[in-house]
Each structure stands twice: as structure tokens, then as C-alpha cells.
Amino acid sequence: MSNPEEITEVVEVAADEYVSVEEPEVAEDIEAAAAPQAPIVIDRPIQTVGRRKEAVVRVRLTPGSGDFKLNGRTIEDYFPNKVHQQLIKAPLVTVERAESFDIVALLHGGGPSGQAGALRLAIARALIEVTPEDRPALKSAGFLTRDARAVERKKYGLKKARKASQYSKR
């Protein structure tokens, strides 16, 4: 094998073997996956509740075109922060139904962050009632877990929940 001509022949034979391998046809699978899901038909509006911190949100989900009405206002008016808008739409994007449902929500209590988290939970719960087979995807993304974190109460004898006044040894 020390002869350079023999090495060249071996490389050419090996290259021919690898080139002749046929690639699997994946185009059909891509087209099937890219096809939009069939429209959902439900006999009545789905109503769910979501909570986070002090916020409570009641959601009414109906088949539609992806419109949001939050206390009578659009999502852009109610949540001007794009981060909150993405947080709210995340469950719909996860199950690839962002344009399939209209959402009417009544929000009260808490602030923008708590209301956005509560709305996300309520939407995820409503999507499960419509299509139970979406549950594993929503569960693995963490949309069905109620975030139990809340503000810790202030204790007497302390400045805040845990902050004590300065201690002097002498």
C-alpha cells in the first residue's frame, strides 16, 4: 500500500460507494407537516380561569381568527410590552393554532406581569378542553403549571418580609 497509485485507486473506489447512496425522500413529509391543521368546531365557547400572584383572569375561547379582547381592549392596547404579548400567545403558538381562536378575557387584580401569566394559564387550560391531545406539548412547555410564587408577607419586628434592623453587638 505504499505505492501512491494504489492509494488513489482505493480513495476513488470509496468515493464511488458513498456517492451512489440514495438520499431518502423527505419532501412529502415536509409538505404534510406544513399543511395547516383542520379547523376546530366546538359546540359552545370554552370558559376557563387562570391565576397568578393577585391576578385572576376569566377566558372565553371561541373559534375565530386570532382576535384578543382583554377587558374590551386589544392585546396591543392592554399589554403594550411585547414580552407580555409573546408570553400570552405562547400556548397558541406551541400547538400551532395562533390564528384559530378568538379570545375574550376579563382580567382583574395584580399588575401587568401577574395578569399576563394568569392569562397564559387560562388559555392553555382552554386549549386542552378543545383538543386533549395537545396536553403533552403544553405540559412539557410548562404552560399548565400554576405559578405559586407570591409576595411574602411582612413580619412584625422586621423592616420587610426578611430584612431586620441593623444589629449592634456593643
Curated annotation (Swiss-Prot):
One of its GO terms (biological process) is translation. GO terms for cellular component: cytoplasm; small ribosomal subunit. GO terms for molecular function: RNA binding; structural constituent of ribosome. InterPro entries: Ribosomal_Su5_D2-typ_SF, Ribosomal_uS9, Ribosomal_uS9_bac/plastid, Ribosomal_uS9_CS, Ribsml_uS5_D2-typ_fold_subgr. The keyword Ribosomal protein applies. It holds the Pfam family Ribosomal_S9. Coiled coil: none annotated. It comes from the Bacteria. Keywords: Ribonucleoprotein, Ribosomal protein. HAMAP family: Ribosomal_uS9_B (MF_00532_B). Belongs to the universal ribosomal protein uS9 family. This is Small ribosomal subunit protein uS9. It comes from Rhodococcus opacus (strain B4). The lineage of its organism: Bacteria, Bacillati, Actinomycetota, Actinomycetes, Mycobacteriales.
